[in-house]
Amino acid sequence: MNLKRTLFLLAAVLPLQLSAKVTLPAIFTDNMVLQQQSDVKIWGRAKPGKAVKVTTSWDGKTYAATASASGGWEVRVSTPVAGGPYTVTVSDGKPVELKNVLIGEVWLCSGQSNMEMRVADRVLNYEQEMKEADAYGNIRLLHIDNTTSPVPLDEASVRHGGWQVCSGENIADFSATGYFFGKELYKNLGIPIGLIESCWGGTYAESWTSTEALSEMPYFRDRKSVV
């Protein structure tokens, strides 16, 4: 590669690096639900040593962190009783604003094929259920892609770009068990409900167990790689 081409590539790449905003995992998006009355962990990446601020509109508080040598940072924000919509703004000098954020009850919908079964084409009277789903806009849905890892991950791959507002279209490929559970919760509690689907048909229960926990069980101590 000649000097002229090298200089051209540097000139193209450096502005991108200098203008890069703080980044968040795909689970933090517009339309998300955060657990009420909790200290909720929010994390992401920024340029090492960069100061990061997280501002929550429900109380106007700002939480500060500094990106580590590897670029990681995290804060814990205090959430109020259920309500919204709110905004969460994350900035290292260039703000990223998450809009239409609700505070409520958040549930993980996990398991095998019985949890994986979707609403569309699988549920009795599913067409009517999909028509009625638009009335439940305070139910929000997050669908996690299937991924394997021997250690907990800081980031996850999600479908549909992140959190979705409940609608007929959006519940179509969401867990039927999870959706009807969330719908009943909403009817009984009357507050925002966040549903996170992370399920995989045919998986063993041990596959959902941490390596540390399996290491405490003699039978699995030497079999962790196969579960």
What are the language-model segments listed below?
Residues 7-8, 143:
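Sequence-pattern detector for short linear motifs
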Residues 10-12, 118-119:
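Short glycine-/acidic-enriched loop or helix-start segments at secondary-structure transitions
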Residues 1-7:
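Bacterial N-terminal signal peptides that target proteins for export
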Residues 21-227:
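Cell-envelope and extracellular/periplasmic
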Residues 8-9, 18:
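Cleavable N-terminal signal peptides
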